[in-house]
Each structure stands twice: as structure tokens, then as C-alpha cells.
């Protein structure tokens, strides 16, 4: 199930990059995140950064361990997480055009195994709208933080 969202931000690419890569303090910027726990910090760069992220999901805390798999400064980073028979892949990217600077995020959940595949059918219909709403809220929270600086 692929979910995508984007917002246009009145700010510089470097300011947006600083906001989206401040993983350690993401709970202060993004209202949907309850808690961040850093697990592993690479010697340099972002690739290999690993953390546990706790969000409220249907009224209950849900924690998933994420890590950055690829990144290009001021352009994008990709993350991976694995939980309950699913692999979650996301890309957060910054692009510039005549219309301004756009922050985009895409999240793809891939079921692993027959049970997860069967669960993904009914959950896809229910969860896609919830996921898109949460993703857009995350992007708008980042937009607010960058535009207030």
C-alpha cells in the first residue's frame, strides 16, 4: 500500500533539511510522534541512523524501529522499518521549482508472508486514509516549524 503526500514550504532547502533530519528532536516538531529513542548513530552522515519511534495508533502506543538506508543532503532520505510481518519503506524528499520548495513523503507497506498478505487486503482500505491524514499532518507540522524560524 503506497501513501503519498506533499506540501509547499516557504523556507530554504537547508532549513527544511535541518528540520527533517533532526530525528532526535522530531517529537517536539511532529505532533503525531510521542517519543523518539536513538538506537544507533553513524560516525558520519545519516545512513545507518537507527531509532525507535512511538506514535499513538487507534488509541494505543505503537513503537517501531526505523533506520535510514540512503540519503543525499538537502535532497532526500529513505528509511526502512519491519513490524508484524510488514516491511515499511519511506522516502522524504525536498524539491525546488518555480512554485517554491516542496516537501514530499511516500510510505509503502509491503506484506511479508501469507498471513500479512491476507491481513493487508482489509487493512489497506481502512488504513490508507488514516495513514495519508497522518502523513500530511507530519508534513504540515514540519512546514509550521520551518516557516516560524
What residue ranges belong to the model's regions?
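Hydrophobic beta-strand positions in extracellular immunoglobulin-like domains
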Residues: 9, 55, 107-109
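Amphipathic alpha-helical segments that line or abut small-molecule/effector binding pockets
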Residues: 14-17, 136, 140
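Hydrophobic ligand-binding cavity/cleft-lining segments
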Residues: 1-46
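Short, surface-exposed charged micro-motifs
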Residues: 6, 67, 89-93
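Beta-strand/loop substructures that line and gate deep hydrophobic ligand-binding cavities in soluble
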Residues: 82-136, 144
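Glycine-rich portal/gate segments that line the openings of hydrophobic small-molecule binding cavities
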Residues: 37-86, 97, 102, 137-149
Amino acid at each position: 500500500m503506497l501513501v503519498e503526500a506533499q506540501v509547499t514550504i516557504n523556507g530554504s532547502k537547508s532549513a527544511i533539511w535541518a528540520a527533517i533530519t533532526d530525528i532526535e528532536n522530531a517529537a517536539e516538531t511532529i505532533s503525531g510522534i510521542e517519543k523518539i529513542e536513538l538506537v544507533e548513530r553513524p560516525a558520519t552522515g545519516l545512513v545507518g541512523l537507527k531509532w525507535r519511534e512511538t506514535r499513538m495508533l487507534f488509541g494505543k502506543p505503537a513503537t517501531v524501529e526505523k533506520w535510514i538506508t540512503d540519503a543525499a543532503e538537502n535532497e532526500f532520505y529513505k528509511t526502512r522499518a519491519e513490524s508484524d510481518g510488514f516491511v515499511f519503506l519511506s522516502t522524504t524528499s525536498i524539491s525546488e521549482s518555480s512554485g517554491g520548495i516542496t516537501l514530499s513523503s511516500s510510505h509503502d507497506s509491503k506484506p511479508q508472508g501469507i498471513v500479512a498478505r491476507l491481513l493487508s487486503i482489509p487493512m489497506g482500505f481502512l488504513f490508507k486514509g488514516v495513514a495519508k491524514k497522518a502523513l500530511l499532518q507530519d508534513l504540515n507540522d514540519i512546514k509550521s516549524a520551518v516557516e516560524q524560524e
